[in-house]
């Protein structure tokens, strides 16, 4: 019977066998008592090779009965049982180990695998066990097929391999590298040529100079390798001697100011031999740049003890607190944002309309956004008690980030940028204009922002309005403690700018002043903690004092910033001559990122305008192509409006380029429309959406109400209470560590609950929220 079931099974190279596709059940068990049965197991479908727990096998069968030609009823059930640990000094070491790579080793060393081949006959019907691991009469053919499934790489393993590995590419200097002539004198590989350091040594591949590197995390360095490049700017490539091995090395290009690699190791090996180094015989004996970066990120720890050194009270996963989210390597930014939304940082934010039941027409839920939200919310809100050690949001992260270059990577990201990305994604997927009456929870944080522009010569004014999700508050450029209320006041006082007045017909100065046209249910404040030091963007840790950190009843009052709008009794509007100018509001998160990279405000706005206000990366690429433009850093004025093209028109050259790759014409056209004509992103979209039919729904004719901007927020003011704070430690928002504090009732008392990845504790200290607060959530009372 087993042979007949397995005969036509084709085993893929990678099998999803780490957790259930509908929940977070895994096959892993602690050591078992004698004759005890494992508590946890997964059933690998022999048709689609997806894993389901015992609870959800009937659901998968119903789904395949509804959506597939055949019912998926045959499964390989596996359970992994941990072997009793042997005493080992390293295992007993309490110091936290940093896992830099996932070494491809068998689980046979740590776990015993129990398996059985089973046929499920329907709900409430006993399953048929066709064969099991203890059987002695199973044929070699069937056993070979089962072993192939068990030995196949797991999807989790494939993801982990890249968790801490930097994505390093070649550069023009490695691609065009010419092997140098052998130096006349023997190179001393044991000491810096400019000082007495014997570690952190870098070899110039062009001449053999040995220079020490930069000082890094407790490692001495005087940057003599960099000094050598500055004196010899045609010598950009240097390799770290202590990192050399047959499989890895640290190579830095000073011209590109980035890590790099050779297209292959042939040129590298030949160059090293010139200096008497055989890379095949080398064993790395110093930390690599990857290790140093990971160690630095891991060192950004948040206090888990109070001021007296006592550990914070640990909280168990429950419906009140939810459950923890395990860090996937660099996913703490995602964990903090999700906890903020789901666990009360934005009160009443909910996706309850999705329900808790999975749709029957989705066979592969890992790639379906609705299914991933249902899976996540079921664990965090409906049954968190099942996951006392937290859950891994692996498939959730992959699903939401699959079409975004940054959020699909394993690099650390800016939590504020991710929050806005997530809200936009939910809008597009669940709350588009065609949605019928579903309240959008994202509107809880939205409001209308007013910009009042008054000419300092003629005194006439212009008002403009824009829907907004957060306010980014500039801080003073110092290291002193600052009062957030003073910074908010300074922000709403506005600034003096230059502009061409439509009434005065000349370039003049004007006062540009923001104000609230309406107020949100939850107000998000994002202090700008980035400033330039010696043209290098540095994240600050100014201590901020603000309402609500200590006393819940200490409210934020923003009523004085609620604008009354245009007053015809005391104000005169500017003429409408400037209406031929397009209204453009740049994405503030992208502006902050570009400024962090060292670009000016004017250049950043200009770049975002010319790239469709898409994202910082597109704008950055545009800036690199226009660095020589004489007006790049001049104040930016949007050009006059031109008749808009049909949004469904595409550039024929771009379309032809994609069609030459053999791609479906309808998909190509749709991809170019969705990606604003970007060919690279469009090609990626096509490959990620091969099951799309390439058609657009018929455009709706908007009625008068729909043509008006949706009313957002409240027209009257009320006090705001602080409900959550996302904190960040690190030198940049793209490194370090994120956590979130959410105010909750703990034993009938309001306390701050710290969500630090999978750890949940009641925290009494507010120091981290003062010095490291990055996103503050204030909710209307």
Swiss-Prot record:
Zinc finger annotations (UBP-type) as residue ranges: 169-279
Domain of life: Eukaryota
One Pfam short name: zf-UBP
Principal location: cytoplasm
Protein name from the UniProt record: Ubiquitin carboxyl-terminal hydrolase 14
Protein residues bound to Zn(2+) 2: 192, 195, 212, 224
Catalytic machinery residues: 332 (nucleophile), 737 (proton acceptor)
Enzyme Commission code: 3.4.19.12
Domain UBA: 576-626, 649-689
Domain USP stretches: 323-781
Single Gene Ontology MF annotation: cysteine-type deubiquitinase activity
Chain positions recorded as Zn(2+) 3 binding sites: 204, 207, 228, 235
InterPro entries: Papain-like_cys_pep_sf, Peptidase_C19, Peptidase_C19_UCH, UBA, UBA-like_sf, UBA2_scUBP14-like, Ubiquitinyl_hydrolase, UBP13_Znf-UBP_var
Miscellaneous comment text of the record: Present with 3040 molecules/cell in log phase SD medium.
Similarity section: Belongs to the peptidase C19 family.
Binding site for Zn(2+) 1: 171, 173, 253, 256
């Amino acid at each position: 019977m087993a042979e007949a079931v397995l005969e036509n099974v084709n085993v893929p190279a990678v099998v999803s066998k780490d957790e259930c596709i509908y929940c977070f059940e895994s096959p892993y068990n602690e050591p078992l008592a004698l004759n005890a049965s494992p508590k946890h197991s997964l059933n690998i479908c022999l048709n689609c090779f997806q894993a389901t727990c015992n609870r959800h096998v009937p659901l998968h069968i119903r789904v395949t009965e509804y959506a597939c030609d055949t019912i998926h009823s045959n499964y390989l059930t596996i359970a992994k049982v941990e072997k009793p640990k042997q005493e080992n000094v390293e295992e007993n070491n309490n110091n936290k180990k940093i896992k830099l790579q996932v070494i491809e080793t068998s689980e046979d060393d740590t776990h015993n695998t129990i398996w059985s081949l089973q046929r499920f006959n329907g709900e409430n019907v006993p399953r048929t066990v066709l064969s099991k691991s203890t059987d002695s009469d199973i044929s070699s053919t069937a056993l070979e097929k089962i072993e192939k499934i068990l030995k196949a790489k797991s999807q989790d393993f494939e993801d982990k391999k890249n968790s801490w590995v930097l994505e390093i590419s070649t550069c023009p200097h490695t691609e065009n590298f010419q092997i140098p002539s052998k130096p006349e004198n023997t190179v001393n590989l044991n000491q810096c040529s400019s000082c007495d350091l014997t570690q952190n040594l870098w070899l110039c591949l062009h001449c053999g100079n040995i220079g020490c590197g930069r000082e890094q995390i407790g490692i001495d360095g005087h940057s003599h390798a960099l000094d050598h490049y500055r004196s010899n700017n045609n010598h950009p490539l240097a390799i770290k001697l202590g990192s050399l091995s047959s499989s890895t090395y640290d190579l830095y290009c000073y011209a590109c100011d980035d890590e790099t690699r050779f297209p292959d190791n042939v040129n590298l090996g030949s160059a090293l031999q010139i200096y008497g180094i055989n890379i095949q015989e080398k064993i790395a004996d110093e930390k690599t740049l990857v290790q140093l970066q990971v160690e630095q990120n891991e060192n950004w720890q948040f206090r888990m003890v109070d001021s007296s050194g006592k550990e914070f009270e640990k909280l168990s996963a429950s419906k009140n607190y939810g459950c923890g989210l395990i860090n996937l390597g660099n996913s703490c930014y995602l964990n903090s944002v999700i906890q903020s939304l789901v666990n009360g940082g934005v009160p009443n934010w909910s996706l309850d309309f999705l329900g808790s039941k999975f749709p029957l027409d989705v066979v592969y839920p890992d790639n379906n956004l609705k299914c991933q939200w249902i899976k996540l919310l079921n664990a965090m809100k409906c049954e968190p008690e099942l996951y006392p050690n937290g859950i891994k949001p692996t498939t959730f992260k992959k699903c939401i980030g699959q079409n975004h270059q940054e959020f699909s990577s394993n690099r650390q990201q800016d939590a504020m940028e991710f929050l806005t990305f997530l809200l936009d994604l939910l809008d597009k997927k669940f709350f588009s204009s065609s949605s019928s009456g579903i309240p959008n929870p994202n509107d809880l944080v939205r409001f209308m922002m007013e910009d009042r522009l008054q000419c300092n010569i003629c005194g006439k004014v212009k008002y403009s309005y824009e829907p907004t999700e957060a306010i980014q508050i500039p801080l003073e450029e110092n290291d002193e403690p600052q009062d957030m209320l003073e910074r908010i006041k300074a922000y709403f006082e506005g600034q003096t700018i230059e502009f061409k007045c439509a009434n005065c017909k000349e370039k003049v100065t004007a006062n540009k002043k923001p104000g609230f046209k309406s107020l949100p249910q939850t107000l998000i404040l994002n202090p700008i903690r980035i400033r330039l030091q010696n043209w290098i963007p540095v994240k600050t840790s100014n201590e901020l004092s603000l309402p609500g950190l200590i006393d819940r009843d200490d409210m934020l009052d923003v009523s004085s910033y609620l604008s009354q709008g245009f007053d015809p009794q005391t104000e005169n509007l500017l003429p409408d001559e400037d209406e031929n100018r397009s209204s453009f509001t740049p994405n503030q998160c992208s502006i902050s990122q570009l400024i962090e990279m060292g670009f000016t405000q004017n250049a950043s706005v200009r770049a975002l305008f010319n790239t469709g206000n898409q994202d910082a990366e597109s704008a950055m690429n545009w800036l690199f192509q226009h660095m020589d433009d004489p007006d790049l850093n001049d104040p930016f004025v949007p050009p006059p409006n031109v008749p808009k093209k049909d949004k469904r028109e595409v550039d024929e050259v771009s379309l032809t380029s994609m069609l030459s790759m053999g791609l479906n014409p309808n998909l190509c056209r749709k991809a170019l429309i969705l990606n604003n004509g970007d060919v690279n992103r469009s090609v990626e979209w096509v490959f990620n959406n091969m099951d799309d039919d390439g058609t657009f729904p018929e455009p709706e004719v908007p009625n008068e109400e729909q043509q008006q901007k949706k009313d957002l927020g409240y027209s009257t003011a009320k006090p705001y209470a602080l409900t959550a704070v996302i904190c960040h430690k690190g030198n940049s928002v793209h490194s370090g560590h994120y956590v979130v504090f959410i105010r909750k009732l703990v034993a009938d008392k309001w306390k701050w609950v710290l969500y630090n990845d999978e750890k949940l504790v009641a925290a009494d200290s507010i120091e981290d929220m003062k010095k490291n607060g990055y996103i503050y959530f204030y909710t209307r009372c």
